[in-house]
């Protein structure tokens, strides 16, 4: 089996309804997977039931069987029994903390490596990389490790934008990612803009959507990745 992982920048683009823009990206992963487990651990400011209801409504057109992992007495067994895994956005630190708490990090990696489809957005995409060291989120809780699912061998930065409001004197996103590359010049970071996604199918990695992505690695800073690019070279360990 091969990895089949869709890594969305966000749950919305502009003023579109929840997950509406992502339906064309998500649908191919659901052809042979109807029973999905949703992991809402990144949701801190809402109940898990409320979060689950939003996802079920947003994906209702696909007619999937979606349950929340919080509804199951054994989270590990729930992941094993599902045809696919959904992880939503919110706070990445809280998400990873809970994944470690329930001993799910290794299990999810193993299940996805065996071919179980994975769909994440925002924080759910952050945890798909090597670590969460390039998240935008506030560290409201300390997970045992920053090491993440390693579904792709690089770092992600969802919601990427280098916009700086006039008069604002804080660092831009590009400056923050430059800091990462100064500490770790060998690990690539891909900034994915809202409305876009990365799709890994085995040894193939594609950029989906109508927005470019941006690469940061060593001396390479904010290098545009054109719409529709094949990024399979980022999966090679030699990078």
From Swiss-Prot:
GO terms for molecular function: dipeptidase activity; serine-type peptidase activity. It comes from the Bacteria. The keyword Zinc does not apply. Its main location: cytoplasm. The active site is at residues 122, 137, 159. Pfam families: Peptidase_S51 (PF03575). Its EC number is 3.4.13.21. One of its GO terms (cellular component) is cytoplasm. It is an enzyme of class 3 (hydrolase). It is found in: Cytoplasm. Keywords: Cytoplasm, Dipeptidase, Hydrolase, Protease, Serine protease. SUPFAM superfamilies: Class I glutamine amidotransferase-like. Gene3D superfamilies: 3.40.50.880. It catalyses: Dipeptidase E catalyzes the hydrolysis of dipeptides Asp-|-Xaa. It does not act on peptides with N-terminal Glu, Asn or Gln, nor does it cleave isoaspartyl peptides. GO terms for biological process: proteolysis. Hydrolyzes dipeptides containing N-terminal aspartate residues. May play a role in allowing the cell to use peptide aspartate to spare carbon otherwise required for the synthesis of the aspartate family of amino acids. Belongs to the peptidase S51 family. This is Peptidase E. It comes from Shewanella baltica (strain OS195).
């Amino acid at each position: 089996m091969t990895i089949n992982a869709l890594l969305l920048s966000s749950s919305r683009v502009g003023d579109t309804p929840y997950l509406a823009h992502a339906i064309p990206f998500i649908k191919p992963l659901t052809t042979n997977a109807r029973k999905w487990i949703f992991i809402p651990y990144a949701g801190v400011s809402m109940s898990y039931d409320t979060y689950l209801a939003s996802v079920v409504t947003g994906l209702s057109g696909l007619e999937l069987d979606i349950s929340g992992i919080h509804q199951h007495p054994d989270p590990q067994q729930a992941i094993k029994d599902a045809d696919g895994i959904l992880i939503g956005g919110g706070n990445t630190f809280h998400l990873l903390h809970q994944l470690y708490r329930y001993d799910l990090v290794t299990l999810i990696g193993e299940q996805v490596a065996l071919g179980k489809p994975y769909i994440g957005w925002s924080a759910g995409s952050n945890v798909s990389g090597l670590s969460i060291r390039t998240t935008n989120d506030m560290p409201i809780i300390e997970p045992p490790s920053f090491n993440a699912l390693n579904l792709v061998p690089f770092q992600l930065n969802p919601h990427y934008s280098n916009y700086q409001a006039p008069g604002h004197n804080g660092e831009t996103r590009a400056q923050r990612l430059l800091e990462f590359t100064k500490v770790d010049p060998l690990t690539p970071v891909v900034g994915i803009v809202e409305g876009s996604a990365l799709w890994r199918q085995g040894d193939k990695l594609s950029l989906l959507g109508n927005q470019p992505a941006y690469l940061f690695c060593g001396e390479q800073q904010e290098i545009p990745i054109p719409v529709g690019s094949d990024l399979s070279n980022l999966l090679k360990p030699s990078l």
